[in-house]
């Protein structure tokens, strides 16, 4: 993959771009195998990968420059703006959208936030595309509500220029820190969920819910989880840290008792919408802390699926799972190092199979799916 900004030394987000892609995959696999070297693994499966470019469904653009000539991209470590509108990770459909958005910023008078001076209003633009129907979700991250009326007044022009814009919102982030978004989200369209579909499973993305950024590889990850679970004829399961419900909704059959837990109420609203559309009657989702929920339960399902943030599931939940001893633990991780630490705490389990999913080409990051089975 060629990137002009990388070649010019302006962007180093893809820190492995100089490394041939087969070597990237081999290095990631070696890293994963070294982390699990102290454990017997019954089956290692070949890494799953997708496209090397144009795979991202989401752009997080810092807005800088002037209101008349806004720049979208990132700030270099020396504080100068780097234009990322032509970033090769984005689908080709994004660049013309960015062109329209620059014009809109000027028309609406949305002054870009100046980090050095701590002045201005528009901090970020967050753009997400559905691979299911091409609809877009756009979030304006503002320092305050000062320019909100101007933004709303100018929206009809933007919607006319970009009819694929289905979900629009404003997020208020008043803090002068490198924080992407604030807690307050103001919906600006009636529709507030972007429909997505992986493997015939309807999923929904709301403004403040997490969703994978590499749809083709994410679809493979969910399909693999479903296959592994179905092979063991599981009738009851928990989906902890469930997000919008992607894993649980893939794995649950009509008779499966599924409980999905996620701290984000936005994500839970998406999961419930999907479950209703699928007609699943034995499924429930709740906006709770996953560890608090699990450790308060006296009954354990046959399988516990965990998909934690980078910190892993931690000692408390590992100790609880070891004590309650579900037959299977399906662990999906975006940080294999914390996953390996957690597995070391689950001494009553052996690793049945492991597979790497390269969700983040040209970086050292990857996802991994691991099936743990209770030792007989």
Curated annotation (Swiss-Prot):
NCBIfam families: meth_trns_rumB (TIGR02085), rumA (TIGR00479). This is 23S rRNA (uracil(747)-C(5))-methyltransferase RlmC. InterPro entries: 23SrRNA_MeTrfase_RlmC, MeTrfase_TrmA_AS, MeTrfase_TrmA_CS, SAM-dependent_MTases_sf, U5_MeTrfase_fam. GO terms for molecular function: 4 iron, 4 sulfur cluster binding; iron ion binding; rRNA (uridine-C5-)-methyltransferase activity. Signal peptide: none annotated. The keyword Transmembrane helix does not apply. [4Fe-4S] cluster binds at residues 3, 11, 14, 87. The keyword Heme does not apply. It catalyses: uridine(747) in 23S rRNA + S-adenosyl-L-methionine = 5-methyluridine(747) in 23S rRNA + S-adenosyl-L-homocysteine + H(+). S-adenosyl-L-methionine binds at residues 212, 241, 262, 307. Pfam families: tRNA_U5-meth_tr (PF05958). The active site is at 334 (nucleophile). PANTHER family: RNA M5U METHYLTRANSFERASE, TRNA (URACIL(54)-C(5))-METHYLTRANSFERASE. The gene is rlmC. Its EC number is 2.1.1.189. Belongs to the class I-like SAM-binding methyltransferase superfamily. RNA M5U methyltransferase family. RlmC subfamily. It comes from Yersinia pseudotuberculosis serotype IB (strain PB1/+). It is an enzyme of class 2 (transferase). Coiled coil: none annotated. Catalyzes the formation of 5-methyl-uridine at position 747 (m5U747) in 23S rRNA. Keywords: 4Fe-4S, Iron, Iron-sulfur, Metal-binding, Methyltransferase, rRNA processing, S-adenosyl-L-methionine, Transferase.
């Amino acid at each position: 993959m060629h990137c002009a900004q990388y070649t010019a030394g302006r962007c180093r987000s893809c820190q492995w771009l100089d490394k041939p892609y087969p070597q990237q995959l081999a290095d990631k696999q070696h890293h994963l195998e070294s982390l699990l070297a102290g454990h017997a693994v019954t089956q290692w499966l070949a890494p799953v990968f997708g496209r090397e470019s144009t795979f991202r469904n989401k752009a997080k653009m810092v807005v800088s420059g002037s209101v008349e000539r806004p720049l979208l991209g990132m700030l270099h470590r020396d504080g100068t703006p780097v234009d990322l509108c032509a970033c090769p990770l984005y689908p080709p459909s994004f660049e013309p959208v960015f062109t329209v958005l620059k014009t809109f910023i000027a028309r609406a008078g949305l002054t870009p936030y100046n980090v050095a001076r701590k002045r201005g209003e528009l901090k970020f633009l967050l753009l997400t595309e559905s691979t299911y129907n091409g609809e877009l979700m756009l979030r304006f991250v503002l320092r305050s509500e000062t320019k909100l009326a101007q933004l709303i007044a100018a929206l009809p022009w933007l919607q006319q220029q970009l009819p694929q814009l289905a979900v629009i919102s404003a997020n208020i982030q008043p803090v002068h820190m490198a924080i992407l978004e604030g807690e307050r989200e103001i919906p600006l369209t009636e529709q507030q969920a972007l429909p997505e579909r992986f493997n015939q499973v309807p999923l929904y993305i709301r403004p403040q819910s997490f969703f994978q950024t590499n749809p083709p590889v994410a679809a493979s990850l969910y399909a693999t989880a479903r296959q592994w679970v179905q092979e063991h004829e599981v009738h009851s399961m928990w989906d902890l840290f469930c997000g919008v419900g992607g894993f649980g909704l893939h794995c649950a059959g009509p008779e499966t008792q599924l409980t999905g837990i996620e701290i984000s109420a936005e994500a839970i609203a998406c999961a419930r919408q999907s479950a209703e559309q699928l007609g699943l009657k034995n499924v429930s989702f709740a906006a709770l802390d996953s560890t608090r929920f699990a450790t308060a339960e006296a009954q354990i399902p046959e399988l516990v699926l965990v998909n934690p943030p980078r910190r892993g599931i931690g000692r408390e939940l590992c100790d609880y799972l070891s004590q309650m001893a579900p037959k299977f633990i399906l662990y999906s991780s975006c940080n294999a190092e914390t996953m390996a630490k957690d597995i070391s705490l689950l001494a009553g389990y052996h690793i049945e199979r492991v597979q790497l999913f390269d969700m983040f080409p040209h970086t050292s990051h990857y996802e991994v799916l691991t099936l743990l089975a209770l030792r007989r």
